[in-house]
A protein has these predicted regions:
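Flexible loop residues that form catalytic
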Residues: 28, 125, 165
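H/E-rich (His + Asp/Glu) clusters that bind or coordinate divalent metals
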Residues: 138-149, 155-163
Length: 188
């Protein structure tokens, strides 16, 4: 949470113990644009303080950041108002779940400047015959992986994080399938 990140000394100590130089906040919720603007300001302030201690702070999206509030979407507020100290960790499944194009958003974030998208969460979305959305192994769903991976390469993404929140398969089998599919697509 932002409150936990705001405990600067404790946060830095914890991450230094783990020799971890990156952390990401997994979401903020509000249906008011003013709250999102205030969050962007506060989040940037905390990220700046943590960056001074060697910790890079990012924002990990879900689908609600693409909801239209008043006159803007939270993702637009964040990308326009968070300072360069904040990186973005795009989650491909949740971008698609929101009806947006993951490769386009990777390009939007990359255009903000160097270092703004060091990692991407790779998850696929599958549409069932019953028109239900569900997570699937990378390459087994409906996402345009050639475009996503090209955008990641163009953005100089350093870490490709395969993630599976829920599924029918054993998590390790799911990971194996995703990795095999990514390798078949040329990602090493």
């Amino acid at each position: 949470s932002l409150e936990e990140l705001n405990d600067i000394d404790k946060c830095l100590s914890y991450h230094q113990t783990l020799d971890c130089h990156y952390t990401a906040l997994g979401g903020f919720h509000s249906d008011r644009t003013e709250d999102w603007s205030q969050f962007a300001k506060d989040f940037t302030d905390v990220a700046r303080k943590l960056a001074d201690g060697g910790l890079h702070v990012g924002y990990h999206n879900h689908s609600h950041e693409w909801a239209l509030l008043d006159t803007s979407r939270p993702i637009n507020i964040l990308t326009e108002q968070c300072g360069p100290e904040v990186y973005f960790e795009i989650d491909t499944y949740w971008v698609a779940h929101a009806g947006a194009d993951p490769s386009a958003w990777i390009n939007v974030i990359a255009a903000l400047g160097p270092g703004r998208i060091p990692s991407v969460h790779l998850k696929d979305i599958q549409i069932s015959a019953e028109r239900q959305q569900k997570m699937s192994e990378v390459g087994a769903g409906n996402l345009n992986w050639p475009a996503i991976l090209a955008a990641c390469r163009n953005a100089s993404v350093q870490w490709y994080l395969v993630e599976r929140d829920a599924g029918d398969l054993d998590p390790f089998e799911s990971l194996k399938i995703s990795l095999e599919n990514l390798r078949a697509m040329g990602l090493e």
